[in-house]
Each structure stands twice: as C-alpha cells, then as structure tokens.
Amino acid sequence: MAKILCVLYPDPVNGYPKTYARDEIPNITVYDNGQTAPTPKAIDFKPGELLGSVSGELGLRKYLEGLGHEFIVTSDKEGPDSEFEKHLPDAEIIISQPFWPAYLGPERLAKAKKLKLALTAGIGSDHVDLESAIKHGVTVAEVTGSNSISVSEHAVMMILSLVRNYIPAHEWAEKGGWNIADCVERSYDVEGMHVGTVAAGRIGLAILKRMKPFDVHLHYYARHRLSKEEEEELGLTFHENVEDMVKVCDVVTINAPLHPETHHMFDEAMIKKMKRGAYIVNTARAEICDRDAIVRAVESGHLAGYAGDVWNPQPAPADHPWRTMPWNGMTPHMSGTSLSGQARYTAGTREILECWFEGRPIREDYVIVDGGKLAGTGALSYTVLEHHHHHH
Ligand code: NDP
C-alpha cells in the first residue's frame, strides 16, 4: 500500500460546481502529430467536469482506494506546517499540477525519503528540481501533449487581444462609455505583422498553425529546425538565434520549457533588441522573462504589451507587479487547465498510474526523468546544469 499525495488548486469560491455551462465536450482521441490521447483502462469521471480542484480529486479516489492505497488531496502546499510538508516524508507518489505547483526543491526532495514518482498532471515539470530527482532516483513524468492545444488557443487569444486592445475596450463598454477613440488609440490589425515563436514544439507549432490564416509573417527560433515541408507549408522564417528573430518581430510568443538554457532569456538586453511597440505573449514559464525588465519595458513604452498566464511564484502574491503594470493581459495560470484539457491530463495521469502499479513501462512521451537521468521527452526538451543533453 502506497501513500499518494496530491496537491490541487482550491475549489471555486462559490463551492464545487453542481452544473456546468455546457453538457459535453468534444472527444479528442489523436493529436496533430499522431500521438494518441491518453488510453487508461477506465476513468471514473465525466469529461467536462472540474477535476483539477481539491473536490475533483483528478477523478482518482475510487481507483486508488480500490487498490488499497492511501490518497491524500490538499491545496495546502506552502511552508513547514502545511499538509504537504506533513505528508512529504512518507509519500511514495506526489501528484501536482503546474497551475498550483507543489514545489519540490532540493530540500523537500531530500526530506521525501520514500518518494519514487513525481507526477505532473499537466505539462511542465520545472517545479521539480530535476537534478535532485536524478540524484535521488525519483521518476518524473508528465502528460505530454494533453493540453498543448488548450495553451496554444490561449496564446492566440492573447496575441489578438493585445494587438487589438480588447481588454481596455471591454472595460469601456462595462463602464457605460462609448469612447471609440480611447478604444482605438492603441488598436491595430494583426494582418501583415511579423509573429515569432521561441521554440516550435507542440505548443509553438500549434500557435504558428493557428496564426497562419491571419496572413502574418511567421518566424521561429528553435534548437532543432523543423522539416523543409513544415517550413514551406507555413511559410516560416527560421532564425539561428533568438536575437535575430526578436529584431524583426512585432509579436513574440514564448513556448520553451523552463530550464537552465531558457532561464531569463528575455532580460533587459534581449528586450532592448526587440522593436519598439512589440508585444510578448508568454504562456510557457514566468522565469523565462526577467520580471522587472518586463515591467520597465511596458512602462517606458518599449513593449506595447505583455500577456501570459505564468507567474513566479504561483500563486502570485497580491502585489506582483504583472497584475497591475500597463498594457498587461495577464490571467492566472489557467490555459492548460480548461475543462477540455483536464479531461485529457487526468486520463493521462490515470494511465501513468495504471502503468506504474501494473509494472508496465510509462509511455516514452510522458517520461522526463527515469533511472537517474533525463529520459523520454525530458531528454529531448530539458537540460540540467551538470550535463547537457542534445540528442534528437
Ligand atoms: P514540447 O516538449 O512539445 O516542446 C518544447 C519545445 O521546446 C521542444 O520542441 C524543444 O525543442 C524546445 N526547446 C527546449 N529548449 C529550448 C531552447 N533553449 N531554445 C529553443 N527551443 C527550446 O512541449 P510543449 O510545447 O507542449 O510545452 C512547452 C512548455 O509550455 C512546457 O514545458 C511548459 O513549461 C509550458 N506549458 C504551459 C502550460 C500553461 O498552462 N500555461 C501548459 C502546458 C505547457 P528542441 O528540443 O528540438 O530544441
């Protein structure tokens, strides 16, 4: 019998929903790159339900208790007196979502003596110190592909809303005004603009595909070039380095994982190389940008706007400057946890747990760290400081 510790975000302020806005969600079985959506043997929830908050329990309680395991679910994750720290020393499996990350730094990993599996219900395992996980022989897995489209749709929405000045215009409507000039003094068309992505993995490529019909010029920077066919189909301009790309872009969207190579990639110096009036949309990870350099750039007008849904730390404190800086289109970290995305990543979490308990290998695509090294998707997309992995 194992103790499974699961950290989830709190229920809605008005309580766990009794009804939903829609009765069903489309059933997506295969992703764009041919990867199949999760295939657990069974699920104990109805797709479209709220599963990512504490009462939703990722739909796992019946399954895990049925196997005789102890299943602890909490949102109390910070500080030495938290529920999370209390259960940490004897948890064998920790499940957490990037939206409400149970940070597993070196100290916590040293304390988690029984930990064997750190499972990210979602995508992005940077809240786990991968070097320490490697050192302690902890397996790290995430549900690769499960919410890539959820995030790319959010990024496209943010690009359009920044460029067209949607949020301030909506505020005028709500306030009872009819201030057309106020709404449009910062409103442009995206058509004809240069839009570039940092990284063209699942999310980056999906954003490029979704922006293509807007008749923009598409650019990308990546460590590995896409195929000639993909470049031609989308009319992509490839850049060997980020600097060259940002110089020519009106909109830059960031879609790389957070690891030593991408940490503070967008600092003062990089932002200076961007065109005056450019926009940044970052739904990847906050620490890829230097927080205060972003604030200064929107305040000075060098950047015309910044939007995203990722913050450091999470939850962001009430006085985080990105909440109130000018021309921001921030949301809490929500893009990857739409009800549609949840249905897939909870099914993927179930699939990984079934594999784990039945002694079957976890899909390569889902593995980040295994056997004391970066493996699977982890070996492709991440680096740790000691050793640089660059195979593809
Ligand atoms: P993928 O693994 O499909 O793609 C990541 C890509 O990043 C890979 O193609 C990799 O390319 C590239 N990459 C890694 N390092 C660099 C670098 N230094 N420079 C340029 N490219 C780099 O992941 P996804 O697209 O699904 O997700 C990307 C990230 O988005 C996640 O790691 C996560 O942090 C974030 N995310 C955010 C969510 C949200 O709710 N806001 C939800 C889901 C994900 P290569 O190895 O070929 O260089």
At which residue positions do the language-model features occur?
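Rossmann-like dinucleotide/phosphate-binding beta-alpha-beta segment
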Residues: P26, Y166, A181-R276, R296, ...
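Residue-level detector of alpha-helix initiation sites
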Residues: G124-H127, E142, S146, R202
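Short glycine-/small-residue-rich Rossmann-like dinucleotide-binding loops
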Residues: P98-F99, I123, D250, A256-L258, ...
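Rossmann-like dinucleotide-binding domain for NAD(H)/NADP(H)
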Residues: V140, G277-H392
